[in-house]
Amino acid sequence: MIVRINKSVAFGSVKAPRSKSWAIRLILLSAISDEETTICSIPDSDDTEAALRMIEVLGSKVIRQGNCIRVIPNLRQCGGYVNVGGSGTVMRLGVALASSCRNPVIIDGDETLKRRPIRELLESLRSLGVNVNGDSLPVAINGPVKGNYVEIRGDLTSQYISGLIMLGLVSGITIRVIGDLVSRQYVDLTRRIIEESGCSVGVSNDVITVNECIPRISLSNVPGDYALSGFYTALALATGGLVTVTGLPKPLGYGDDSLVNIFSNAGARSVFSNGDWSVEGGGELRGIVVDLKDSPDLAPVVASIAPFASGETVITGVRHLAFKESNRLETISDSLRAFGVNVNHGDDSLRISGSITHGALIKCPNDHRIAMMSGVVAAGSNGESIIHNAECVNKSNRLFWRDLVKLGVKLTIN
């Protein structure tokens, strides 16, 4: 798919994309329950479909009913082959849960996923007595778990820890996190969803303790996603418009919903009220310094408004962007440079100078957030921009390009 975008002014409102982070965790937890689970407002995304394929291999029956799914679990029937596409979350959480199976589970993925970190998680499972064949995808997992103590690095991806926490519900586990924990908000999210299902997760400094517990999820609606919604509201700042995203939970001031305050700190009018987040452009944006160690998915959103701000925007705490769908330290930099933006990156930071941007040719590196970032910058830039491989947004939000048209962006799809 090729998308062509010309300079626009974005006005209007759109519904918030549903959170795939929430959805994937709810779906996977439903597979280790002992009762039927109904989950509604499931996001239409490649990663969500990967999670559903994963739980079918874990023995669950999935029944689709409109925008809801019913999951009938049967962990005793787990086993088989599954391809999880490009979903790092499903890969890592799924590998951990597959360790509870007494039949082999073979997990595979696309070429982008085969380059992403997993070896440390596999080593931790081996230390728990799990039979693991392979050090990268495809990998064969054959449980059960025989130990209950594991140490694992926290500085590569928080998904290692989230996966082991979920496994702990089946077998009991004590996890010692070695080094800094990145993307902490996602471990907090895993813990929150588990506790809402009636189980508990103990945390004391760098040690996490999970006792065996059967999660029971009542009818659950997947909430809106701030990191994905941020690309819509960023359009208002890039184009001098006014955009409202509806259907979002009340911001808590940390994690992905900190975008509401980040935009305000940059000089924008950014207001949340009764589930709606409104952002108005047209005023003077200023460069800011922001640490995104706990919220790495916000980096492409902040980067999308940085060219339209005066001065320099500095994004820190982003070392682990190198291990995303693409090396985002490089792909954010390369994409912005194509628009004429002055960008420098180190091992743990991005420095972006406000610039007069022009149209660009972007060959998206199969990374949904890079495509979305490029779409925002293109809408605020002089001349025509062309984005190749634009269908990569389907990983998290199939409606992205349609929604941009709804907001008034001059966009054609070929």
Swiss-Prot record:
Recorded catalytic activity of this chain's protein:
3-phosphoshikimate + phosphoenolpyruvate = 5-O-(1-carboxyvinyl)-3-phosphoshikimate + phosphate
Q: In which pathway does it act?
A: Metabolic intermediate biosynthesis; chorismate biosynthesis
Where on this chain does phosphoenolpyruvate bind? 20, 88, 116, 159, 328, 369, 395
One GO biological process this protein is involved in is: amino acid biosynthetic process
Task: Please name the Pfam families in this protein's record.
Answer: EPSP_synthase (PF00275)
Q: What class of enzyme is it?
A: transferase
GO MF annotations in UniProt: 3-phosphoshikimate 1-carboxyvinyltransferase activity
Which domain of life does this protein belong to? Answer: Archaea
Q: Where in the cell is it found?
A: Cytoplasm
Q: Which InterPro entries match?
A: Enolpyruvate_Tfrase_dom (IPR001986), Enolpyruvate_Tfrase_sf (IPR036968), EPSP_synthase (IPR006264), RNA3'P_cycl/enolpyr_Trfase_a/b (IPR013792)
Q: Name one GO cellular component term.
A: cytoplasm
Q: Which residues bind 3-phosphoshikimate?
A: 20-21, 25, 157-159, 183, 297, 324
EC number, UniProt record:
2.5.1.19
> Keywords for this entry?
Amino-acid biosynthesis, Aromatic amino acid biosynthesis, Cytoplasm, Transferase
Q: Where is the active site?
A: 297 (proton acceptor)
Query: What assembly does the database describe for this protein?
Result: Monomer.
Q: Which PANTHER family match?
A: AROM/DEHYDROQUINATE SYNTHASE, PENTAFUNCTIONAL AROM POLYPEPTIDE
Task: Tell me its family.
Answer: Belongs to the EPSP synthase family.
* Known function: Catalyzes the transfer of the enolpyruvyl moiety of phosphoenolpyruvate (PEP) to the 5-hydroxyl of shikimate-3-phosphate (S3P) to produce enolpyruvyl shikimate-3-phosphate and inorganic phosphate.
Q: What is this protein called?
A: 3-phosphoshikimate 1-carboxyvinyltransferase
